[in-house]
Amino acid sequence: MDIVIFDGYTINPGDLSWGKLEALCGRLTVFDATPPDKALSRLGDSEILITSKCQITRELMEKCPNLKYIGSTATGYNNIDVKAAADLGIAVTNIPAYSTNAVAQHTIALMLEITNHVGLHDRSVQQGQWCECEYFCYWKKPVLLLTGKSLGIIGYGAIGKKVAEIARALGMIVNVYSDDPEGAMKSDFVSLHCPLTEENAGMVNTEFLVNMKPGAVLINTARGGLVDERALADALKAGFIGGAALDVLAEEPPSKNCPLLGIENCIITPHIAWVPKEMRQAVIDNLAENLKSWLDGGMLNRVD
């Protein structure tokens, strides 16, 4: 069977091996990225498709009758029309919980950047401001202590639990939304760790933000679609909340018109929470395990 990978670069820009997948197929073709108008020609008669973010529509599946298996390289698979796949007898798998430690680490890193302003102070030193200072230390913005601060967690799966574990080790008070909605919403930090569904898309709207504690910080390392970006931008500018730290946006990469770009108290990283080499290797390992299970008649991580 032939395998086509539509968007392999973000998983393996050249520092890993595709060998485990190559061992399971007759031919492996890897594209760094695939625009929508190239999807049909690149998939062609191949039986197996691997993708992360490409939109896999019913129309594409129907035009590729040889397609038998779609492997998502992510935990979320909103980009795949799973109902269409089920209707057409195409297996779909995902990779759950592979990035727990990395995403939790990045969540805490974003929180620490908000409280300690590491980047700001490094830039200040590199610009010579410490050399010109008459004191042995200085700070451009107040540095906040996390000990005793509260963290509200919305979405208490593997990542949410790991974030809670680290936060408690730092002396924070953790409020889990499913146990205490009011406590979570009124925390000093509110961190999103829930999947994106039709029901919760855009749930971080004006009402949500106004109900947060004044001066609180929103953190999102889950899915960009959970947040109404215009509402968040307006809330930040109006001072309803103290800041935001985001690793995901509704559109990735964002357009230059994204309302969150250029806002001083909004930190954005380019969806890098999952990218440590160990995590990307885990993706390839899990892809191979899922595919081998399907080839052997198994159901490992099936979502169709």
Question: Where does each model-flagged region fall?
Answer:
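Short beta->alpha connector loops at strand-helix junctions that form conserved
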Residues: 32, 73-74, 90-101
